[in-house]
Protein backbone atom coordinates (compact mmCIF):
# COMPACT_ATOMS: atom_id res chain seq x y z
CA UNK A 1 0.00 0.00 0.00
CA UNK A 2 1.39 3.36 -1.02
CA UNK A 3 0.73 6.54 0.93
CA UNK A 4 2.29 9.96 1.43
CA UNK A 5 2.66 11.61 4.83
CA UNK A 6 2.32 15.39 4.82
CA UNK A 7 3.21 17.27 8.00
CA UNK A 8 1.85 20.83 8.34
CA UNK A 9 4.18 22.87 10.55
CA UNK A 10 2.91 26.30 11.53
CA UNK A 11 5.43 28.50 13.34
CA UNK A 12 3.30 31.03 15.21
CA UNK A 13 0.88 28.99 17.30
CA UNK A 14 -1.15 31.13 19.70
CA UNK A 15 -0.94 28.55 22.47
CA UNK A 16 2.73 27.66 21.93
CA UNK A 17 4.81 29.92 19.63
CA UNK A 18 7.71 28.25 17.75
CA UNK A 19 6.34 24.87 18.82
CA UNK A 20 7.77 22.76 15.94
CA UNK A 21 11.31 23.74 16.97
CA UNK A 22 11.14 23.00 20.69
CA UNK A 23 13.81 20.63 21.96
CA UNK A 24 12.67 17.16 22.95
CA UNK A 25 15.43 14.83 24.12
CA UNK A 26 18.07 16.66 22.09
CA UNK A 27 16.12 17.10 18.84
CA UNK A 28 13.51 19.55 17.55
CA UNK A 29 9.97 18.20 17.88
CA UNK A 30 9.43 18.27 14.13
CA UNK A 31 12.38 15.91 13.60
CA UNK A 32 10.83 13.34 15.95
CA UNK A 33 7.56 13.55 14.00
CA UNK A 34 9.38 13.22 10.67
CA UNK A 35 11.36 10.18 11.86
CA UNK A 36 8.19 8.37 12.91
CA UNK A 37 6.61 9.19 9.55
CA UNK A 38 9.63 7.80 7.69
CA UNK A 39 9.42 4.54 9.65
CA UNK A 40 5.72 4.10 8.81
CA UNK A 41 6.36 2.80 5.30
CA UNK A 42 5.27 6.01 3.59
CA UNK A 43 6.53 6.41 0.04
CA UNK A 44 7.17 10.11 0.69
CA UNK A 45 7.28 12.45 3.66
CA UNK A 46 6.60 16.12 2.93
CA UNK A 47 6.60 19.06 5.33
CA UNK A 48 4.59 22.20 4.57
CA UNK A 49 5.47 25.28 6.58
CA UNK A 50 5.07 29.04 6.71
CA UNK A 51 8.50 29.66 8.24
CA UNK A 52 12.01 29.93 6.78
CA UNK A 53 13.72 28.52 9.87
CA UNK A 54 11.61 25.36 9.77
CA UNK A 55 12.11 25.15 6.00
CA UNK A 56 15.91 25.28 6.39
CA UNK A 57 15.96 22.68 9.18
CA UNK A 58 13.80 20.20 7.27
CA UNK A 59 15.68 20.75 4.02
CA UNK A 60 19.00 20.21 5.83
CA UNK A 61 17.70 16.83 7.02
CA UNK A 62 16.94 15.74 3.45
CA UNK A 63 13.15 15.85 3.65
CA UNK A 64 10.89 17.33 0.98
CA UNK A 65 9.58 20.66 2.19
CA UNK A 66 7.34 23.39 0.81
CA UNK A 67 7.31 26.98 2.03
CA UNK A 68 3.68 27.98 1.67
CA UNK A 69 2.80 31.37 0.27
CA UNK A 70 -0.54 31.96 1.95
CA UNK A 71 -2.15 32.20 5.36
CA UNK A 72 -4.45 29.28 6.09
CA UNK A 73 -7.08 28.55 8.70
CA UNK A 74 -5.99 24.93 9.20
CA UNK A 75 -3.36 22.35 8.43
CA UNK A 76 -5.70 20.61 6.00
CA UNK A 77 -6.05 23.80 3.96
CA UNK A 78 -2.25 24.04 3.82
CA UNK A 79 -2.10 20.52 2.35
CA UNK A 80 -3.79 21.59 -0.87
CA UNK A 81 -0.84 23.78 -1.83
CA UNK A 82 1.51 20.79 -1.45
CA UNK A 83 -0.83 18.53 -3.41
CA UNK A 84 -0.92 20.98 -6.31
CA UNK A 85 2.80 21.85 -6.12
CA UNK A 86 3.91 18.22 -6.21
CA UNK A 87 1.17 17.23 -8.71
CA UNK A 88 -0.22 14.52 -6.46
CA UNK A 89 -2.93 12.43 -8.13
CA UNK A 90 -6.51 12.29 -6.86
CA UNK A 91 -6.31 8.58 -5.96
CA UNK A 92 -3.20 8.99 -3.81
CA UNK A 93 -3.63 8.29 -0.08
CA UNK A 94 -2.52 11.25 2.02
CA UNK A 95 -1.81 11.02 5.75
CA UNK A 96 -2.03 14.40 7.44
CA UNK A 97 0.19 14.06 10.51
CA UNK A 98 0.15 16.96 12.95
CA UNK A 99 3.62 18.20 13.89
CA UNK A 100 2.68 18.19 17.59
CA UNK A 101 2.29 14.38 17.66
CA UNK A 102 5.98 13.44 18.12
CA UNK A 103 5.17 10.31 20.13
CA UNK A 104 2.71 8.72 17.70
CA UNK A 105 4.48 5.58 16.54
CA UNK A 106 4.98 4.44 12.97
CA UNK A 107 2.56 1.50 13.21
CA UNK A 108 -0.31 3.81 14.12
CA UNK A 109 0.51 6.10 11.20
CA UNK A 110 0.45 3.12 8.84
CA UNK A 111 -2.78 1.73 10.29
CA UNK A 112 -4.73 4.96 9.77
CA UNK A 113 -3.87 4.77 6.06
CA UNK A 114 -4.62 1.04 5.99
CA UNK A 115 -8.10 1.55 7.48
CA UNK A 116 -8.89 4.17 4.85
CA UNK A 117 -8.17 1.73 2.04
CA UNK A 118 -9.56 -1.47 3.57
CA UNK A 119 -12.88 0.05 4.61
CA UNK A 120 -13.22 2.33 1.57
CA UNK A 121 -13.54 5.37 3.81
CA UNK A 122 -13.68 9.09 3.11
CA UNK A 123 -11.62 10.06 6.16
CA UNK A 124 -9.85 7.90 8.73
CA UNK A 125 -8.51 9.11 12.06
CA UNK A 126 -7.49 7.86 15.49
CA UNK A 127 -8.58 8.13 19.13
CA UNK A 128 -7.37 6.73 22.43
CA UNK A 129 -9.21 6.23 25.75
CA UNK A 130 -9.06 9.08 28.24
CA UNK A 131 -7.80 7.73 31.54
CA UNK A 132 -8.29 10.56 34.03
CA UNK A 133 -10.77 13.26 34.96
CA UNK A 134 -8.28 16.09 34.38
CA UNK A 135 -8.08 15.30 30.65
CA UNK A 136 -11.86 15.33 30.30
CA UNK A 137 -12.04 18.96 31.39
CA UNK A 138 -8.91 20.12 29.53
CA UNK A 139 -9.97 22.29 26.57
CA UNK A 140 -6.66 21.54 24.83
CA UNK A 141 -7.60 17.87 24.63
CA UNK A 142 -10.15 17.24 21.90
CA UNK A 143 -12.83 14.74 22.79
CA UNK A 144 -14.75 12.65 20.26
CA UNK A 145 -17.92 10.57 20.50
CA UNK A 146 -18.54 7.81 17.98
CA UNK A 147 -21.50 5.76 16.83
CA UNK A 148 -21.91 1.97 16.94
CA UNK A 149 -20.01 1.60 13.65
CA UNK A 150 -17.04 3.73 14.70
CA UNK A 151 -17.94 6.94 12.90
CA UNK A 152 -17.55 10.30 14.63
CA UNK A 153 -20.72 11.98 15.84
CA UNK A 154 -18.94 15.08 17.12
CA UNK A 155 -15.57 16.48 18.22
CA UNK A 156 -15.32 19.07 20.98
CA UNK A 157 -13.02 20.80 23.43
CA UNK A 158 -15.88 20.59 25.92
CA UNK A 159 -16.84 17.53 27.93
CA UNK A 160 -18.58 15.04 25.64
CA UNK A 161 -20.50 13.02 26.53
CA UNK A 162 -21.70 14.78 29.67
CA UNK A 163 -22.38 12.56 32.67
CA UNK A 164 -22.77 12.66 36.45
CA UNK A 165 -20.32 9.86 37.24
CA UNK A 166 -16.57 10.34 36.81
CA UNK A 167 -15.11 7.31 38.55
CA UNK A 168 -11.99 5.83 36.91
CA UNK A 169 -13.75 2.80 35.41
CA UNK A 170 -16.45 4.93 33.82
CA UNK A 171 -13.93 7.40 32.43
CA UNK A 172 -11.77 4.70 30.84
CA UNK A 173 -14.73 3.10 29.08
CA UNK A 174 -16.66 6.15 27.90
CA UNK A 175 -14.34 9.01 26.96
CA UNK A 176 -12.09 9.25 23.91
CA UNK A 177 -9.26 11.64 23.09
CA UNK A 178 -8.76 12.51 19.43
CA UNK A 179 -5.24 12.12 18.04
CA UNK A 180 -4.00 14.59 15.43
CA UNK A 181 -3.77 12.41 12.35
CA UNK A 182 -6.04 11.93 9.31
CA UNK A 183 -5.92 9.79 6.21
CA UNK A 184 -7.85 10.60 3.04
CA UNK A 185 -7.40 10.63 -0.70
CA UNK A 186 -5.95 13.71 -2.37
CA UNK A 187 -9.26 14.15 -4.18
CA UNK A 188 -11.01 14.73 -0.85
CA UNK A 189 -8.44 17.33 0.24
CA UNK A 190 -9.21 19.25 -2.95
CA UNK A 191 -12.93 18.99 -2.14
CA UNK A 192 -12.36 20.12 1.45
CA UNK A 193 -10.52 23.23 0.28
CA UNK A 194 -13.64 24.29 -1.64
CA UNK A 195 -15.86 24.11 1.45
CA UNK A 196 -16.45 27.32 3.37
CA UNK A 197 -15.53 27.29 7.05
CA UNK A 198 -18.44 26.21 9.23
CA UNK A 199 -19.64 28.07 12.30
CA UNK A 200 -18.97 25.05 14.53
CA UNK A 201 -15.42 24.81 13.20
CA UNK A 202 -14.86 28.47 14.09
CA UNK A 203 -16.45 28.17 17.53
CA UNK A 204 -14.46 25.09 18.54
CA UNK A 205 -11.37 25.89 16.47
CA UNK A 206 -11.45 22.34 15.09
CA UNK A 207 -10.92 21.83 11.37
CA UNK A 208 -12.48 18.34 11.31
CA UNK A 209 -15.90 19.82 12.12
CA UNK A 210 -16.01 21.26 8.62
CA UNK A 211 -16.08 17.68 7.33
CA UNK A 212 -19.04 16.73 9.52
CA UNK A 213 -20.80 20.02 8.76
CA UNK A 214 -20.92 19.14 5.06
CA UNK A 215 -22.30 15.68 5.72
CA UNK A 216 -19.14 13.61 5.26
CA UNK A 217 -18.19 10.86 7.68
CA UNK A 218 -14.99 10.38 9.66
CA UNK A 219 -14.07 6.86 10.79
CA UNK A 220 -12.34 6.72 14.17
CA UNK A 221 -10.07 3.80 15.05
CA UNK A 222 -9.85 3.40 18.82
CA UNK A 223 -6.45 2.15 19.96
CA UNK A 224 -4.87 1.60 23.37
CA UNK A 225 -1.59 3.42 22.82
CA UNK A 226 0.73 4.01 25.75
CA UNK A 227 2.62 7.31 26.10
CA UNK A 228 0.76 8.95 23.23
CA UNK A 229 0.24 12.62 23.92
CA UNK A 230 0.39 15.76 21.83
CA UNK A 231 2.27 18.95 22.64
CA UNK A 232 -0.37 21.69 22.64
CA UNK A 233 0.92 24.09 25.28
CA UNK A 234 4.19 24.65 27.20
CA UNK A 235 2.71 22.78 30.18
CA UNK A 236 2.53 19.61 28.06
CA UNK A 237 6.32 19.50 28.12
CA UNK A 238 6.04 18.33 31.73
CA UNK A 239 4.61 15.03 30.46
CA UNK A 240 7.88 14.27 28.70
CA UNK A 241 9.69 13.90 32.02
CA UNK A 242 7.55 10.89 32.83
CA UNK A 243 7.69 9.49 29.30
UniProtKB/Swiss-Prot annotation:
Q: EC number(s) on record?
A: 2.7.7.38
Q: Which gene produces this protein?
A: kdsB
Task: Give the protein's recorded name.
Answer: 3-deoxy-manno-octulosonate cytidylyltransferase
By sequence similarity, the record places it as follows: Belongs to the KdsB family.
Q: Which GO terms describe its biological process?
A: CMP-keto-3-deoxy-D-manno-octulosonic acid biosynthetic process; lipopolysaccharide biosynthetic process
Q: Which InterPro entries does the record match to this protein? A: Cytidylyl_trans (IPR003329), KdsB (IPR004528), Nucleotide-diphossugar_trans (IPR029044)
Q: Which organism is it from?
A: Wigglesworthia glossinidia brevipalpis
CC annotations in GO: cytosol
Which keywords accompany this UniProt record? Cytoplasm, Lipopolysaccharide biosynthesis, Nucleotidyltransferase, Transferase
Reaction catalysed by this enzyme: 3-deoxy-alpha-D-manno-oct-2-ulosonate + CTP = CMP-3-deoxy-beta-D-manno-octulosonate + diphosphate
